[in-house]
């Protein structure tokens, strides 16, 4: 359950709010842990592991963090989104999180921004 506590800290340190995050990549060591994080943080399910989590893609022991970062970065670039929060659960309830930003983000072509301009 560590990501439920690590994600808000990382997001706050980045000067953002949970609403600013376009996608959350949360390691799915266990389904119950990810469901808890979604409910505890009040996240929209469509913004969490949209390409499938470790249960669907596999749990690459020893390289979970790398897989999460690459998946999040690819999602941001492919969908012209700006921010992702990436988080790992660690044994005994600990967690780690980071926020990444798409350096190629173009707000003029972002669907949500375009709608907001109308």
Question: What residue ranges belong to the model's regions?
Answer:
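Claisen-condensing/thiolase-fold acyl-transfer catalytic domains that form or cleave C-C bonds
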Residues: 1-117
């Amino acid at each position: 359950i560590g990501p439920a506590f690590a994600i808000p800290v990382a997001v706050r340190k980045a000067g953002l709010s949970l609403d600013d995050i376009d996608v959350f990549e949360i390691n799915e060591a266990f389904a119950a842990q990810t469901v808890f994080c979604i409910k505890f943080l009040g996240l929209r399910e469509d913004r969490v592991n949209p390409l499938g989590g470790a249960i669907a893609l596999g749990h690459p022991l020893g390289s979970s963090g790398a897989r999460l970062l690459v998946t999040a970065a690819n999602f941001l670039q492919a969908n012209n989104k700006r921010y992702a929060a990436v988080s790992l659960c660690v044994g005994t309830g600990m967690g780690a999180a980071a926020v990444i930003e798409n350096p190629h983000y173009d707000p003029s072509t972002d669907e949500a921004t375009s709608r907001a301009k109308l």
